[in-house]
Structures are given as C-alpha cells and as structure tokens.
Amino acid sequence: MKSDYINRDVMGHILFALNPVNRLVCKVALETGLRIGDILEFKTFDIVFKKSFTIREQKTGKSRKITLREPLRKELQDISGTYYVFEHRTDPHKHRARQTVYTDIKRVCKLFKVKENISPHSIRKLYAVDMYKKTGDMSKVQKALLHDNELTTMLYALSDILHSKKR
C-alpha cells in the first residue's frame, strides 16, 4: 500500500507525539527530503566535523550533498552515537532500523485515529509539495528528490491535490 500525503498541521501533531529520536529523524526528512533509510545512515563524524557532507542514496546509488541548518545540526550532534548519529538500541556499530521509525509513526497515527496511510515516506511527499509551492518549479523538485522521471516527481509534488481529489 502506498503512503498518503499528509498536511503540515497534522504532521506537526504526529511529530509532537513521536519518540524524541524518531522525531528528529523526521525533522531531518522534512528539511532535506531524504528517505528515512538514508538519514539513519548519517555518520557522527560528518555531523560533528563538517558543515556539508555527501551521502550515497541507498535506493538509487546517487550521491547528494547535504547541508543542514545549524540548529538542526546541533540537535543531531547532541544525540549522536559513537559511529552513527542514530545509533541502534543495542549495538553502537549499527544504526537505528527504519522499522523503528515506521512503527512509532504508525503508533501515533493509531493514537490520533488518522485515517490516511501515513508512513515515513509521507514526509518526502510533504517536502516535495512544500518545495513546489515555494518555487513553482517542477525541475527543482525533481533535482532535490533525485528523480530520473518528471512524472514521478509530479506524483510527489502534486500529492496534496491528488489526495484531496481522492477523498
């Protein structure tokens, strides 16, 4: 089942109720548009010692340069583990699992009786919608999401409209 779009107000309520570390993962996703799996692989060294760093996306294998706003970078530094920013609960040599973030989001959605199918990927759609509204330029959104196909980008950037028509 595909993840649904969710507006910023509802997302704000969901973020508020998440576990603090999972909330921070989602805040990074809202700022960067990255997939959760890519965020969970952030290395402590990169966050502490670099203003910008490059990641290789798991799904596409494409490289992307990341620059975080200083307040968010500081939050990440404060929770950083020995090797990964988002350390695994029992093994510091592993990062937190994607399933952990997913399960927490599902828990909160159930608590708030959210009918839409919200998942971490819904945040990527919200990022695309916000960027498209801000810039009005589909090619900028496509570049930010590293999509090869503009039609794929349109599904993300216009997901608010598609969601409202579905209702």
Regions found by a protein language model. Name each.
Residues I47-K50, D137-A157, I161-L162:
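Short, polar N-cap/turn motifs at the start of nucleic acid-interacting alpha helices
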Residues D4-T32, I36:
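Basic, Lys/Arg- and aromatic-enriched nucleic-acid-binding interface segment
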Residues Y5-R8, T32, E41-K74:
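Conserved tyrosine-mediated DNA breakage-rejoining catalytic core shared by Y-recombinases
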Residues A29-E31, Y132-K133, A157:
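Short amphipathic helical patch at the helix-1/turn junction of helix-turn-helix
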Residues Q58-Q77, Y83-K106:
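C-terminal catalytic core of Y-nucleophile DNA break-rejoin enzymes
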Residues I123, Y127:
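Active-site His/Glu-centered metal-binding helix of metallohydrolases
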Residues D38-I39, N117-I118, A128, G136-H147:
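Active-site-proximal segment of tyrosine recombinases
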